[in-house]
């Protein structure tokens, strides 16, 4: 394991109404993070080098490299001058999963499907979420998104990171994870939820970004019934959420928002 700085204070020249002046601000760190399984690198992403164990577990689950956290027998984080290698040992190397999700190229920030070899893999079929009687109030949706923004410590300093949070009614946010990449932030959150053994069907995942199809895929892989976002969804994200029995809520502004799929899970406060 290794401790990595996730932000840095940098000096710069700023132009204000009074003219040029020396200034400083805190900016997030960014580093190449390699995901390696049984000695083979599967993917390299540019990411904020924090919560790396959560990141590795969440990525492994959402990419279907493992189906249970127990399939990761060992996890080591090794820092090099050029980046970080997260080295995982699988109890039984699932060759078919690794081959099916093979990525040989680096994924830039904000790219959740970069490096996937085919359209079929990018739009892989999802098992629809099981029907459940759980409902959430309009106040729950508003609270999930509002509390996420307030809990983003790194973004408060840098104004440069996305956030993802897991919210349970009556309890509030369980966890918040941040990253320069929205997909990475959600993977980190999924890893945190999995490590704690929480019941995903009892909560809401809130995100600070738009809703693309990859974000829907990851939420469904976690098993959460509701995905709530500050920004708008894509048409493909809506179709995917509908087919997967996921309630997709977007453009959340307090208790005003749009519900695009499976509206019955949301009731008036």
Curated annotation (Swiss-Prot):
Q: Where do transmembrane segments lie in this chain?
A: none
Q: Which SUPFAM superfamilies does the record cross-reference, listed alphabetically? A: Cytidine deaminase-like
* Predominant cellular place of this UniProt entry's protein: cytoplasm
Q: Which GO terms describe its cellular component?
A: cytoplasm
Instruction: Cite the active-site annotation.
Output: 111 (cysteine persulfide intermediate)
Q: Which UniProt keywords apply?
A: Cytoplasm, Molybdenum cofactor biosynthesis
Which Pfam family, just one, is annotated for this protein?
FdhD-NarQ
Q: Where in the cell is it found?
A: Cytoplasm
One GO MF term on file is: sulfur carrier activity
Family affiliation: Belongs to the FdhD family.
Q: Which PANTHER family would you find in this protein's record? A: FORMATE DEHYDROGENASE (PTHR30592), SULFUR CARRIER PROTEIN FDHD (PTHR30592:SF1)
Q: What does this protein do?
A: Required for formate dehydrogenase (FDH) activity. Acts as a sulfur carrier protein that transfers sulfur from IscS to the molybdenum cofactor prior to its insertion into FDH.
- Tell me what this protein is called: Sulfur carrier protein FdhD
* Species lineage: Bacteria, Pseudomonadati, Pseudomonadota, Alphaproteobacteria, Hyphomicrobiales
Q: Which gene encodes it?
A: fdhD
């Amino acid at each position: 394991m290794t401790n990595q700085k996730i932000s840095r204070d940098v000096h710069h020249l700023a132009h204000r109404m009074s003219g040029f002046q020396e200034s400083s601000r805190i900016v997030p760190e960014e580093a190449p993070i390699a995901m390696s399984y049984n000695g083979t690198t599967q993917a390299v992403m540019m990411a904020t080098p924090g919560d790396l164990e959560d990141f590795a577990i969440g990525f492994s689950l959402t990419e279907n490299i493992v189906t249970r956290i127990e399939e990761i027998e060992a996890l080591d984080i090794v820092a090099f001058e050029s980046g970080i290698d997260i080295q995982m040992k699988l109890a039984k190397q699932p060759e078919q999963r690794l081959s099916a999700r093979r990525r040989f190229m680096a994924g830039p920030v904000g790219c959740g499907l970069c490096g996937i070899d085919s359209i079929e893999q990018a739009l892989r079929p999802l098992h629809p979420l099981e029907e459940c009687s759980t409902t959430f109030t309009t106040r729950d949706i508003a609270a999930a998104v509002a509390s996420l923004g307030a809990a983003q410590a790194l973004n408060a300093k840098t104004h440069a990171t996305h956030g993802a949070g897991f919210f349970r009614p009556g309890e509030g946010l369980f966890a918040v994870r941040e990253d320069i990449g929205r997909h990475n932030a959600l993977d980190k959150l999924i890893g945190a939820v999995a490590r704690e053994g929480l019941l995903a069907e009892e909560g809401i995942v809130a995100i600070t970004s738009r809703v693309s199809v990859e974000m829907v895929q990851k939420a469904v892989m976690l098993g959460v019934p509701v995905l709530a976002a500050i920004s708008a969804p894509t048409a493909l994200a809506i179709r995917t959420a509908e087919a997967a029995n996921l309630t997709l809520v977007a453009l959340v502004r307090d208790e005003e928002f749009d519900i695009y799929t499976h509206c019955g899970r949301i009731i008036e406060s």
